[in-house]
């Protein structure tokens, strides 16, 4: 698959932080091949056969950070296949280390631009997409880099099954408002909310993450939005 130029479709920042220690590098190099999705091959039919264990539903998490949420959900729901996208090398290493330690086998990963994976996925193949605490790109000149856009909502709509869910969490008010407006203007999604508690209460079974704890310490509350494909 052709690699996109970062000038046009780069929704992530840096790809590498501190140099990995030798053992961390060994973990990454030994485990990544077994978990990595190869986009040069056509998607398998059915897509659930990506996983070495039987799964009945499929869920995508874009930008899984340290992997706390993804691992928690994978262990909580062994019959769901989880696809995680994260271009940041250090975060990928942490996720794979946790997968190795816990024995979670219902996980597959992609380590580049999420739009490439979305374009590779078959129509109506996913039950849920999670975009949790994405980079808010706070400067106005960078807003075009925010992952929530009409183009990406079109991508979400194509790959989600009818009635599939798009879940978005953020502690940045401007990005929450941005997402509400983008989804309102998109004809393919309904916001599932009857009252404030619906978007101020964490998702069922939600594990707090380090990023969320940091936001709390700094006095920021979070919003948890859920949209259904129509």
Swiss-Prot record:
Q: Which GO terms describe its cellular component?
A: tRNA methyltransferase complex
Instruction: Write down the top EC class of this protein.
Output: transferase
**Keywords noted in UniProt:** Methyltransferase, S-adenosyl-L-methionine, Transferase, tRNA processing
Gene Ontology MF terms: tRNA (guanine(46)-N7)-methyltransferase activity
Q: Where is the active site?
A: 135
* Family matches, as CDD domains: AdoMet_MTases (cd02440)
Which InterPro entries does this UniProt record tie to the protein? SAM-dependent_MTases_sf, tRNA_(Gua-N-7)_MeTrfase_Trmb, tRNA_methyltr_TrmB_bact
Name the reaction it catalyses: guanosine(46) in tRNA + S-adenosyl-L-methionine = N(7)-methylguanosine(46) in tRNA + S-adenosyl-L-homocysteine
Could you tell me the EC number(s) of this protein?
2.1.1.33
Q: Which PROSITE patterns match?
A: SAM_MT_TRMB
UniProt pathway annotation: tRNA modification; N(7)-methylguanine-tRNA biosynthesis
- The residues that the entry says bind substrate are 139, 171, 209-212
**SUPFAM superfamilies according to UniProt:** S-adenosyl-L-methionine-dependent methyltransferases (SSF53335)
Q: Which residues bind S-adenosyl-L-methionine?
A: 61, 86, 113, 135
Q: Which Pfam families match?
A: Methyltransf_4
Please describe what this protein does. Catalyzes the formation of N(7)-methylguanine at position 46 (m7G46) in tRNA.
The family this protein is said to belong to: Belongs to the class I-like SAM-binding methyltransferase superfamily. TrmB family.
- From the Swiss-Prot or TrEMBL record, give the protein name: tRNA (guanine-N(7)-)-methyltransferase
Name the source organism: Rhizobium etli (strain ATCC 51251 / DSM 11541 / JCM 21823 / NBRC 15573 / CFN 42)
The uppermost taxa in this organism's lineage are: Bacteria, Pseudomonadati, Pseudomonadota, Alphaproteobacteria, Hyphomicrobiales
């Amino acid at each position: 698959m052709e690699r996109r130029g970062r000038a046009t479709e780069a929704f992530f920042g840096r790809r590498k932080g501190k140099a990995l220690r030798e053992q961390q590098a060994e973990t990454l190099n030994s485990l990544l091949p077994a978990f990595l999705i190869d986009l040069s091959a056509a998607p398998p039919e059915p897509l659930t056969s990506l996983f070495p264990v039987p799964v009945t539903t499929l869920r995508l998490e874009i930008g899984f950070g340290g992997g706390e949420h993804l691992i928690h959900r994978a262990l909580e729901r062994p019959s769901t296949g989880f696809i995680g996208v994260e271009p940041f090398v250090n975060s990928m290493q942490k996720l794979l280390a946790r997968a190795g330690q816990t024995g979670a086998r219902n996980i597959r990963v992609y380590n580049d631009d999420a739009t490439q994976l979305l374009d590779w996925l078959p129509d109506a193949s996913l039950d849920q997409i999670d975009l949790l605490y994405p980079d808010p790109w706070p400067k106005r000149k960078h807003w075009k880099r925010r992952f929530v856009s009409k183009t990406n909502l079109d991508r979400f709509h194509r790959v989600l099954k009818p009635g599939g869910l798009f879940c978005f969490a953020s502690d940045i008010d401007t990005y929450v408002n941005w997402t509400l407006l983008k989804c309102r203007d998109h004809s393919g999604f309904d916001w599932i909310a009857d009252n404030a508690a619906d978007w101020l209460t964490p998702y069922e079974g939600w594990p707090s993450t380090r990023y969320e704890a940091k936001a709390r310490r700094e006095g920021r509350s979070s919003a948890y939005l859920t949209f259904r494909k129509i």
